[in-house]
Every structure is written in structure tokens, then in C-alpha cells.
Amino acid sequence: MANQQIGGSTVTYNGAIPMGGPVAINSVIEIAGTEVLVDLKLDYATGKISGVQTLYIDLRDFLGDVTVTMPDTGQRITARAGTQGYYPVLSTNLMKFIVSATIDGKFPMNFINFPIALGVWPSGIKGDKGDPGAPGPAGGTVVVEDSGASFGESLLDTTSEPGKILVKRISGGSGITVTDYGDQVEIEASGGGGGGGGVTDALSLMYSTSTGGPASIAANALTDFDLSGALTVNSVGTGLTKSAAGIQLAAGKSGLYQITMTVKNNTVTTGNYLLRVKYGSSDFVVACPASSLTAGGTISLLIYCNVLGVPSLDVLKFSLCNDGAALSNYIINITAAKIN
């Protein structure tokens, strides 16, 4: 038997809270026929970020799988189409990441300098027949599940009645998801208690003219949404609830929150869209060209929320407008997730 040579040790940046505090670099990755090299060496050298220990990959509106390779350690992460989540990273101060995908397109990805437990959950907007762009969840609900859950023949009861098959729940599992793709049906048993890995509290809403939104959103006027009538498509824990003011944070739920807001509109393709998230006295505003929002434009933020126990103050507020035209045909998907 040949001896296996073991190389020398490598200093990595995992398992420690950085002294400079939590930092994330937000980006939108565009794949066009080839892999993309993300080089954060300059950001590291100038002190903008102290290292990368976690990736947040948002593929809710992306129909292909994405692979991220760390050339310094050889680690390779693959994120499935239609999911979003946090992936622990094994990296050094090389600060280079190779990103590839099975199809061309754009998707948000955040580089985070502190460790977050693995947490991956399905898209909150997956619709009928598996169409991620459909305005509604499949079967009226979307199950939050452990990304590692899977099952084999041992969970299938082939002695059931003709034309039927029984699927046994995974031990400690939270449910079974059935997705109708038209020519085939996918049955998946979920496990892990439905906690979404490191995500303890999360809420996903769909806001449109048919789900609580006004018939028209005025041009160039950011007015906070009344989310009391928004459709709840995904909910984890009890720390986040919808209200007329926005997404209410429960007492004792201070921490870091991942906020994403995606808008689609097929009628207004000129000017710019303004997307705003507010918490307390802080406003976060992003401007997106209207032409990009026909396929979906996203604001993705990491916000530390200090919950004071005062309901009128402990609320995330959302608003959107076009700077030149009123909106009458829109779908807005809003997700807030407590990650630590």
C-alpha cells in the first residue's frame, strides 16, 4: 500500500468573529457563457473586509445551479436552482472565488466575514408546475426544509395500492412536499425539523394588486407598504409577523437580519425604480434601471436590528416606486430572515 503524502498546514479564516465587526460585500454575479472570477484582494488589502467565512447565494429567480470554487483550499460549493441560503466557506487571504453556473444570467451573492451556520431554504415564490416566476406558491404552501434531506428506496412503500405510492417521513422530519411538473410529479420527504439550518425566524411575503397592494403605486413617491393583506408564502418561527406597518419584530429578537426585496413589472420599462427598506431611523435605498426589472430586480441587505420592545419602532418597512411613471402591474416579493 502506497503512503499518502499530507501537505503543510494552511491558515484559514473560519470559526472566528472578526475584530472589526460583521461586514458583508454585496454583489450581483452575471454569468455569460463562461465562469467568473471574483477577486476581493483589493477589498482585503484596503481593510474593507477582513476575510470571507460565509457566502449568501440567492437563486430564487435563477433557473440554473451555481458552483463556487475556492482555488486556495479547493473547496467547492454547489447551490441548487430556486434556493437561497448561507454556505460556510473555507478560504485564506487569497480572496479569490471562481463562480460558474449551468445557465447564463444574474443572481445576488454576498461575501460575509463572519461564520454563519449552513442554512438553505427553497424559493418563497415557487409556483404551479415548478415555475419560480408564477405568482403564488405550489399547493398553497412552501415547505422550509433542511437542504441535506433526501430519501431512497427504504422510504418507499411499493406494496401500496395500484397507481399509488406511499412515502414515509424521515425520522424527525417535518413534512412531505409534492410538486406537479405536468409530465412528472416530484415527492420529497423533508427532515431536520424544518428550521432552515441556522435560520431561526424568517418570513416571506408576496405583495401585488391582488394580495394587499394598491391598484397603482404613484410615480416618484416612496410610501411605506401596508403589508397586512400581503400573501404569506413562507414562515419560520414566531419572531416575524406581517402588519400594516411592515414586518414586525418580536421582543427579544435583536440580531442580524438578511433582507431581500425583489420586484417584477412588465409594463413600465423606462426610468429607474427606487427600492427602500427602513428600520428605526435608518433608510436603505437602491436605484435599479427599469429595464432590468422586467426579469426581476433585487435589493439584498444585511441589517442589525436592535429590538427595543416597542412595536411602533421594532418594524421593518418597505416601499418602492418608479421615478417617472405610476405602477399598475407589479409583483413584489419580500423576505426577512434572522441569521444570528
From Swiss-Prot:
Chain segments carrying region Domain-1: 2-122
Protein name per the record: Spike protein P5
Subcellular location per the Swiss-Prot or TrEMBL entry: Virion
Keyword DNA-binding appears in the UniProt entry: no
Domain notes: The short collagen-like region is proposed to act as a trimerization signal leading to the fulfillment of the symmetry requirement of the minor capsomer.
Native species: Enterobacteria phage PRD1 (Bacteriophage PRD1)
Function: In association with P31 and P2, forms the spike complexes located at the 5-fold vertices of the capsid. Essential for viral infectivity.
Region of interest called Domain-2, as start-end residue ranges on this chain: 142-340
One family name in Pfam for this protein: PRD1_P5_C
Record keywords: Capsid protein, Virion
CC annotations in GO: icosahedral viral capsid, spike
Gene giving rise to this polypeptide: V
UniProt domain Collagen-like: residue ranges: 123-141
